[in-house]
Regions:
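Non-transmembrane, aqueous-exposed alpha-helical and coiled segments at domain scale
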Residues: 2-307
Length: 307
């Protein structure tokens, strides 16, 4: 049974969860509203995406750029959670934690779902090689391995955060999947194979000991918080038109970005969501490849870009 901090175990009316999401192609300013709402929450959950999404939060006049960490990490009274729907690149996450702690932010409250999947070196290499192979038909990915990581999750061959806690299981899974990845690298892209020992050395010896204190039952924490009447903010990355199913496919991200993804990515039921807040901005922008029907060019377009 998860024990809650005293401030969560209060006898008040139950406060269901709130979802904050973008309604366009991203960069709508979700971080600003998240910052305002977070102050009335006890838990803030990032429920999908990876380090391909960034957002900026301003707290007490200080600006913080975040990639994987939810904005709740900036508040000492909030438990920040990385949900099972996120794909985690350990080095990026640890570097982000280190940068924040160097600025006086305490990240010890962070909880990472053991069911979240890991972004592996072969994901990043295959992402870049596939884009190059597609040439003029490329999708414009960030080449950070997000798509291949989600593909392995769907194929049921992905490694998860909790695998870092058991070296034997991690190595067994790694050797199985790496055999296939190396065959693709060699026979399709004429690349040298990756070393299982080298990958395991980084992930088990370098990353696992530092991430272990954060790994826990994220779903249990969220449910216990809601049951105790605590507020939970579900923080989405990217936006609606980049959703894998409902966006401008194939020029989309590799996860579901709409409100429904908060249920699967954080482990809550739809009836536990009280509010879904969609953020839009006055004029739409889009980064990367893909259709943009309302694009403004010329002098006005240049002026909007500069602003």
């Amino acid at each position: 049974m998860i024990s809650l901090p005293p401030e969560l175990a209060r006898k008040e009316a139950r406060v269901p969860a709130t979802v904050v999401m973008g309604t366009q192609w991203g960069d709508e300013g979700k971080g600003k509203l998240t910052d305002l709402l977070a102050k009335e929450m006890q838990v803030v959950v990032r429920y999908q995406g990876g380090h391909n999404a960034g957002h900026t939060v301003v707290v007490d006049g200080e600006s913080f750029a975040l990639q994987l960490l939810p904005s709740g990490v900036l508040y000492p009274f909030i438990t920040p959670v990385i949900g099972n729907g996120v794909v985690v690149e350990p080095k990026v996450l640890l570097d982000e934690i280190q940068r924040l702690e160097a600025r006086g932010v305490d990240c010890a409250r962070l909880v990472i779902s053991g069911s979240a999947h890991l972004v592996m070196p072969y994901h990043q290499e295959l992402d870049a090689l596939t884009e190059r192979y597609l040439g003029k038909n490329k999708l414009g990915t960030t080449k950070r391995g997000i798509g291949p990581a989600y593909a392995d999750k769907a194929a049921r061959v992905g490694l998860r955060v909790q695998d870092l806690l058991d070296a034997k299981i991690f190595r067994q899974k790694l050797e199985v999947v790496l055999k296939e990845k190396n065959a693709i690298l060699a026979k399709v892209y004429n690349r040298l194979p990756l070393s299982a020992d080298e990958i395991a050395g980084h992930y088990l010896d370098e990353y696992a000991p530092r991430l272990a204190p954060y790994i826990g039952d994220a779903v249990g924490l969220v449910q216990a918080t809601l049951a105790a009447g605590g507020g939970v903010l579900l923080e989405g990355a990217q936006a609606t038109f980049l959703d894998l199913d409902h966006g401008t496919y194939p020029f989309v991200t590799s996860s579901n970005t709409v409100a429904g993804a908060a249920c699967t990515g954080a482990g809550i039921g739809p009836r536990q969501i009280e509010r879904v807040i969609g953020i839009a901005k006055a004029y739409v922008t889009r980064v990367g490849a893909g259709p943009f029907p309302t694009e403004v060019s010329g002098e006005l377009g240049d002026a909007l870009v500069e602003r």
